[in-house]
Swiss-Prot record:
Post-translational modification comment from the UniProt entry: Under oxidizing conditions two disulfide bonds are formed involving the reactive cysteines. Under reducing conditions zinc is bound to the reactive cysteines and the protein is inactive.
CDD domains: Hsp33
Function recorded in the entry: Redox regulated molecular chaperone. Protects both thermally unfolding and oxidatively damaged proteins from irreversible aggregation. Plays an important role in the bacterial defense system toward oxidative stress.
Location, primary (coarse class): cytoplasm
UniProt KW Disulfide bond keyword: yes
Keywords: Chaperone, Cytoplasm, Disulfide bond, Redox-active center, Zinc
Subcellular location: Cytoplasm
Family: Belongs to the HSP33 family.
Species, as recorded: Streptococcus thermophilus (strain ATCC BAA-250 / LMG 18311)
Name used for this protein in its record: 33 kDa chaperonin
Cysteines engaged in disulfide bonds, as pairs: C235-C237, C268-C271
InterPro entries associated with the record: Heat_shock_Hsp33 (IPR000397), Heat_shock_Hsp33_C (IPR016154), Heat_shock_Hsp33_N (IPR016153)
């Protein structure tokens, strides 16, 4: 089971989240049949949203849109505060690696665009904020968003590693944030550690990468574990929801669908679940 660990430095001046999102991203890859670059890009977006959602309270829903003008198209993710996330990438078929190293490429295929966050508190007035993509690598773009839009200096590392068959091997990451009251001396110490820490891909290869991440972030500094939360890829789509969507088309459109197409098939963008509606089903909706 994937998990996210929340921690705070003993001084109360820094907080860090470390997470294992391997099963989340593996499920996304299986559902969307993504190739290497698309898998990594979608996975990084899901991890970023898991971190954002962990910062929210109540029954908020958080939508992250990474909107680029490159080959990927848009990447959309929706998360709740209970550890569930879902998402999709417009082009699941991008598969480009560096010839010399085999490194999966992401940034060049994201292109220029925006990192957008929409937080729905359930009050009917969602809060939207966005920042430009600075690299298209998603992790750096997310850190820039947190620092610029949420006004919280942040360090972020997130990645998805694939095996020789391009299946998800491990996925996860961390977020470190400076809290009010941190001294310049403390900030300098943490900055030095972050600059000197091993690459996120190296830390993810560790036997227990959550512990490896926390050790790299805190070093010898004492810290407290605040909570451990379960994470998963989970879609909340349902037949009833799509029935309601069909009803919004109006009776004439439903009648045409029944007469010309002899039914309807709707595929959920987020999880690829197919919902079949027969002529009899459509007739029932028309008479509803």
């Amino acid at each position: 089971m994937d998990k996210l660990i929340k921690t705070i430095s003993e001084s109360g001046s820094f907080r860090a989240y470390a997470l294992d999102s391997t099963e989340t991203v593996r499920t996304a890859q299986e559902k969307h049949n993504t190739l290497s670059s698309s898998t990594v890009a979608l996975g990084r977006t899901l991890i970023a949203n898991q971190i954002l959602a962990a910062n929210q309270k109540g029954d908020s829903k958080i939508t992250v849109k990474v909107i680029g003008n490159g080959s990927f198209g848009h990447i959309i993710s929706v998360a709740d505060t209970k550890g569930h996330v879902k998402g999709y990438i417009q082009n699941p078929g991008v598969d480009i690696k560096k010839t010399a190293t085999g490194e999966v490429l992401v940034g060049p295929f994201m292109g220029h665009g925006q990192f957008v966050s929409i937080i729905d508190y359930g009050t009917g007035n969602p809060y939207t904020s966005s920042t430009p993509l600075i690299s298209g690598e998603i992790g750096e773009d997310f850190a820039y968003y947190l620092t610029e839009s949420e006004q919280t200096p942040s360090a972020v590392g997130l990645n998805v590693l694939l095996d020789k068959e391009d299946k998800v091997k491990v996925a996860g990451g961390f977020m470190l944030q400076v809290l009010p009251g941190a001294s310049e001396e403390e900030i300098a110490r943490y900055e030095k550690r972050i600059q000197e820490m091993p690459a996120i891909s190296t830390l993810l290869e560790s036997d227990d990468h959550i512990e490896a991440l926390l050790n790299a972030i805190y070093g010898d500094e004492p810290f407290k574990r605040l909570s451990e939360e379960e994470l998963s890829f989970e879609c909340d789509c349902s037949r009833e929801r799509f029935e309601n969507a069909l009803l919004t088309l109006g009776k004439d459109e439903l009648q045409a669908m029944k007469d010309e197409d002899h039914g309807a098939e709707i595929v959920c963008q987020f999880c690829q679940t197919k919902y079949e509606f027969s002529e009899a089903d459509l007739e029932e909706l028309i008479n509803d």
